[in-house]
UniProtKB/Swiss-Prot annotation:
Gene Ontology MF annotations: ATP binding; ATP hydrolysis activity; ATPase-coupled transmembrane transporter activity
UniProt-listed InterPro entries: AAA+_ATPase, ABC_transporter-like_ATP-bd, ABC_transporter-like_CS, ABC_transpr_CbiO/EcfA_su, ECF_ABC_transporter_ATP-bd, P-loop_NTPase
Keywords attached to this entry: ATP-binding, Cell inner membrane, Cell membrane, Membrane, Nucleotide-binding, Translocase, Transport
Pfam families per record: ABC_tran
Similarity remark: Belongs to the ABC transporter superfamily.
Name of this chain's protein: Putative ABC transporter ATP-binding protein sll0385
Coiled coil (UniProt feature): none
Keyword Transport: yes
């Protein structure tokens, strides 16, 4: 365990799926029925969902909604992939979950707390498509330390977390380097180290493999495969989603059109093609 991160090398390839209260993939009109079922199960459960989205809608400047009345939830420790064709609303959804946009309607709860746009939640970590977007300090050490410093930890605690995170990610030799001089893979490892140092209970990843080579992509899969807190991934890299996630949601035209076990949903070629997606090569 690392400050709330639990590591278990057997997590990669784990296919213990979670689909709300059921075990079958849900598609089409059955999605709303599943939403109501999830709400009932949440009321019964003493443990609140890690993420709960209710009647969430968003439109840019009064235009046609990009997201329309979404309702879903994620259990603690669940690994959810959000997939869909370009322009379906995935990135907008993640910007809302990160608090970088304010919803036009509806609510988002993270760890039982209502999300407020612009509010920093140390329990929630973000890994962006371009790691450069979250590296801004004068040294790698300062970038990793930023999160713990804003959590109110003592200087000694911050130093301990930075050193532990750097050791776990194999970047101890980079701590004095300038972030802008690193390779894409090294930058991604620095971003991951910053997340490790914060020990988030929820990790949101938006297109995390987009700028990575094969080696860095495998390193990222290894780390996410061992992360046993709640994980959300938005990606066009469907093989990556299949390897890391146990559940997927397909979004099309701003609505959830399928929700279920990752392998079952993504193996359904008719379903995938009907929403502009290709069946992963490993399932063909």
């Amino acid at each position: 365990m690392f400050n709330g991160f639990r590591f278990n090398g057997n997590r990669i390839g784990d296919r213990r799926w979670f689909c709300g209260g059921g075990g079958e993939p849900v598609t089409g009109t059955n999605v709303r029925a599943m939403d109501r079922s999830q709400e009932k199960e949440a009321i019964k459960s003493p443990i609140p969902p890690a993420i709960r989205v209710r009647e969430l809608s968003f439109a840019y400047g009064g235009q046609t909604p990009v997201l329309n009345n979404l309702a879903w939830q994620v259990a603690p420790g669940e690994r959810l992939g959000i997939i869909g064709h370009n322009g379906c609303g995935k990135t907008t959804l993640f910007l809302l979950l990160c608090g970088l946009l304010k919803a036009s309607a509806g609510t988002i709860q993270l760890l039982g707390q209502a999300l407020e746009a612009g509010k920093f939640l140390p329990e929630v970590g973000f890994l962006f498509q371009n790691p450069t977007d979250q590296l801004f300090a004068t040294s790698v050490w300062d970038d990793i330390a930023f999160g713990p410093q804003n959590m109110g930890l003592s200087p000694a605690q911050v130093t301990e977390r930075v050193n532990q995170a750097a050791e776990l990610t194999g970047i101890t030799s980079l701590l004095d380097r300038l972030p802008q001089h690193l390779s894409g893979g090294e930058k991604q490892m620095v971003a991951i180290a910053g997340l490790l140092a914060m020990a988030p209970k929820i990790l949101l990843c938006d297109e995390p493999t987009a700028s990575l080579d094969i080696k860095a992509r495998r390193q990222l899969i290894n780390f996410l495969g061992q992360f046993q807190q709640t994980l959300l991934i938005s990606s066009h890299d469907l093989e990556f989603v299949l390897e890391v996630c146990n559940r997927v949601i397909i979004i099309d035209q701003g609505q959830i059109v399928a929700d279920g076990p990752a392998q079952e949903i993504m193996a359904d070629q008719t379903l995938m093609e009907s929403h502009g997606l290709e069946k992963p090569y490993s399932l063909r």
